Amino acid sequence: MRYEFSTIEQKWQKYWADNQTFLTDDNPDKPKYYVLDMFPYPSGTGLHVGHLEGYTATDIIARYKRSRGFNVLHPMGWDAFGLPAEQFAIKTGTHPTTTTQKNVSSFRQTLQNMGFSYDWSREINTTDPNYFRWTQWIFLQLLDKGLAYMSEVDVNWCEDLRVVLANEEVDEKIAAGHTVVRKPLRQWVLKITAYAERLLGDLDELDWPENVKQMQRNWIGRSEGVEIDFELPCHRQKLTVYTTRPDTLFGASYLVISPEHPLAEKLATAPQLVELKNYIREAKLKTELERTGLQKEKTGVFTGSYAINPANGEALPVWVSDFVLTSYGTGAIMSVPAHDSRDWEFAKKFGLPIIEVIQSPHDVQDEVFEGKESICVNSSNNEISLDGLDFTSAFKRMADWIESSGKGRRKINYKLRDWIFSRQRYWGEPIPVKHYDDGSLRPETDLPLTLPEVEAYHPSTTGESPLANIEDWLFGQDEHGAFRRETNTMPQWAGSCWYYLRFIDPSNQQQLVDPDKERYWMNVDLYIGGAEHAVLHLLYARFWHKVLYDLGVVSTKEPFQKLFNQGMILGEDNEKMSKSRGNVIPADHVMQSYGADAVRLYEMFLGPLEQVKPWNTNGIEGISRFLSRVWRIVYPEQEGPAMLTDTPLDDALTRRMHKTIKKVTEDTEHLKFNTAIAEMMVFVNELHKAGCRNRKALETLLLLLAPYAPHICEELWQAAGNNEPIARAPFPVFDPALAEDNELTIAVQVNGKLRGTFLAPAGLSKEAMIAGAREIESVKKFLEGMTIIKEIAVPGKLVNFAVKPL
C-alpha cells in the first residue's frame, strides 16, 4: 500500500472535525496549558510558507501537552479590522465585510488543511459586533477612569491614505512611499503613561526574550534627571529644562526649545520674528523621524533672547530647533556641546561656546567627549563645587543644590507618550461616545454601536472619517438632548489588545469573560509570534491587561507569561517574501505537492525555531522520503500492513528507544524541534537496519512523531490495531537508566592535544580509564621517552597525560 498523503490527510482532518477531537472543556480538575498564536490579519494574498512556521510550532506544543495530560487551550481567530480592507473598498466599492469574510474563509481552510488542532468552536473575529461590543466596553472603562481623553494634538498625518498614524507606524509608511506630515487634529488619547512604571517593572517577571524586554524598556525610556529653572530677565518668566546630566550645568552655553514650545514666538525679538515664524511653520510639516534623525543636518534660529544659567549667572542664548520635541521632557533643553555630540555639532555650525566641564583626554574644541567615567572640572561657584567628583557624586550634589536653592527639582521622565487612539477611517470599531450641543460627553449605553452602511469609503476632506457623511447615523436625540456621534474609529490594535481573554469565554453575552474561567486559564503559558510586535501589540496588550486587572476583570498582572519569537522564513532568494519581489511561496501550493505533514516537518527541520532561514523547495524532498520510510515500517509491501510482533526488543534497540524518547521529550519542551526531528530520523534508521516489526518500538515512534506529523501517525496507529486516535494517546515515558549511554567515548589527550579515543563502559573508575588510555596504540607513541608528570581523568569524558622529556 502506497503512502497517499492527500487521501490520508483529508480522512483524518474530517475525523477530527466530525468527532470534535480538539474541543476544549473548562475542566478545573486537570492542569491547564494555554498556547496561543499571534492571530493573523486575513489579507487577500493568503498564507505563504513563512506564515505557517509559528502556527506549526504552537500546534506541536498543543498536541504534545495534550498527550502529557494537560487540558490545552489552543484557539484561532482573526484580527480583521484594518486599513488594507478599507483601501480595497475604496478601489472596488466592495464592502470590507465581504472582503474580510472571503479572506477569513481562505485562511481558515489553509490552517485546517495543515491539520492544526485548534478548537474552532472558540473562533473569534474582531469585526464581529459580538466581539467588538466588549472592545467598546473596555474603552468606556478607560473613559470612566480618566484614562481616555480628547486632545488637540499634532499627529502623523498620511496625506495619501488620509489617516493618522501611530508614531510606531511612520517608518513603515514612509518606506512604502507615502507622504507623512505633522498636523493638528482632535484626537482620542489613551493615558498609557499612567502605567509606565508598572509596564517597566513587571518586565522582570516575564519569561520573554531579553531583546524584546530591552526594546520595551527603551521604548518606555525611563530616565532620572532634574528640571532646572532658567530666568528670562527680559520677559519676567522662567524657562524650565529637563536634563539627565545636571553635573554638566556649568558647561551649558545655550538653550534650545522646540518649535511648538509656548514661548517660541514670545521670546523672538523683532529682528528675529519673521525668520522664526517661517522656521516654525516648516518644522510643523516634518515628521518626528525627519526631525530627530542622527544624520540630519542641524538647523535652528536664534530667538534674540537670553536665559540666565543658575550655576554661574552666565547669559545663555535661547534657540529654536526642530530636533527638540515638545512631547519629551519640557520641550526645552540645556546644551553642553563639550559633552554631547548633537550639541557639539549645533555649536560648531552656529559658532556657540564649547566649555569643558568633564575632564577630557583631548581638546573638546576639536572633538566632543561624552564619557561619564572622568571627573568634573571648571564646575564651582561660591555655594557649590563639583570639581574632582565622579558622575554619581556630582549628579547628587548638583541635584541637592538645585532643590535646596529653589532652582529646580528632581524628576523622573519617560520617552513613552500617551497612545493616540483615533483613526479617521470607516473600517474600525466605532468609538461609543456621543457629543451633546452643550459640550458634554456621554457614553453609548446600548452596545455594540455598529457601523452604518456607506456609499463611499473615502475619508472626508476635513480629516474626519466617512462616518461624518452618514447623517442619519451621525445625529440623534435622547433624554439628554441633541447629540452628534463620534466619527473617529479605533485603531487596529484595539481588538488585539484583549483577544486572548475572549478565547477563554467566546460566547458570553453577559461578561467580557467569566471570572472562574479566567482564573483557570490565565496567564497564557506560551505565546508565539514575530519580534516585530515588541513595542506595538505587546506593549498595548500589557497596558490594557493592567487596566483590566485594576478593574478586577482579570486575576493576573500580565497576560503572557512566556513569549517566543520565531525567526523569519525567507524566500529561496534569501530575501523577505513579498509580492513585489515575486518570491512568495503559497502554502497551499506546497501542501498540494508534498502534503501537510511534510510541510510541518520541513518548517521545523529548517533550523532552530528562533533563527532566520531561507526556504529551499529541494529540501522538502528529503522530509518526504523520511515520511515514506516511516510508512514502510508498517507497510513494507504494497499489499497490506506487516504483522507486528510483541517479541521483546534486544538491549541495544531498547536503549536506543529510551534515548530517543528522552531526547525528543526534552527538545520538544524547549522548542528545539529541529533536533527532535533529527533524533527521530536516527531512530527510524535503526528500526530499518534491524528489520524491526516490534509493536512497542513502532508505537513509540508514532507517539513521538504524532505532534509533528499527525496525519501519517493517525493512519499508521490505526493500521497497528488501535481504536482510539493517537491524538488522545499518552506520550511515551523514558526509563532514565535505559536512556543513559552504557558505553561512552573517552577522549585521550597528551599535553592537552587529542591523541586518540576509546570506548568504555559508563561508570568506569578513573584508574580504569587511565589504564585503558595507556593501551591505545596512537597514544603510546606520545608517551614513549616521556616522564608522566600528571594524569587527569574526567569520568565519562577524557584522560589527559601531562608529560615532559626524560
Curated annotation (Swiss-Prot):
Molecular function GO labels: aminoacyl-tRNA deacylase activity; ATP binding; leucine-tRNA ligase activity
Organism: Prosthecochloris aestuarii (strain DSM 271 / SK 413)
EC code: 6.1.1.4
Keyword Lipid biosynthesis in annotation: no
UniProt entry tagged with the keyword Lipid metabolism: no
Protein name in UniProt: Leucine--tRNA ligase
Chief location of this protein within or outside the cell: cytoplasm
Subcellular location as annotated: Cytoplasm
InterPro entries: aa-tRNA-synth_Ia (IPR002300), Leu-tRNA-ligase (IPR002302), Leu_tRNA-synth_edit (IPR025709), M/V/L/I-tRNA-synth_anticd-bd (IPR013155), Methionyl/Leucyl_tRNA_Synth (IPR015413), Rossmann-like_a/b/a_fold (IPR014729), tRNAsynth_Ia_anticodon-bd (IPR009080), Val/Leu/Ile-tRNA-synth_edit (IPR009008)
Binding site for ATP: 579
Annotated Gene Ontology cellular component terms: cytosol
Family the UniProt entry places it in: Belongs to the class-I aminoacyl-tRNA synthetase family.
PANTHER family given in the database record: LEUCINE--TRNA LIGASE, MITOCHONDRIAL, LEUCYL-TRNA SYNTHETASE
Positions of short motif 'HIGH' region: 40-51
Record keywords, A-Z: Aminoacyl-tRNA synthetase, ATP-binding, Cytoplasm, Ligase, Nucleotide-binding, Protein biosynthesis
Enzyme superclass (EC): ligase
Biological process annotations from GO: leucyl-tRNA aminoacylation
CDD domains membership: Anticodon_Ia_Leu_BEm, LeuRS_core
Reaction equations catalysed: tRNA(Leu) + L-leucine + ATP = L-leucyl-tRNA(Leu) + AMP + diphosphate
Position of sequence motif 'KMSKS' region: 576-580
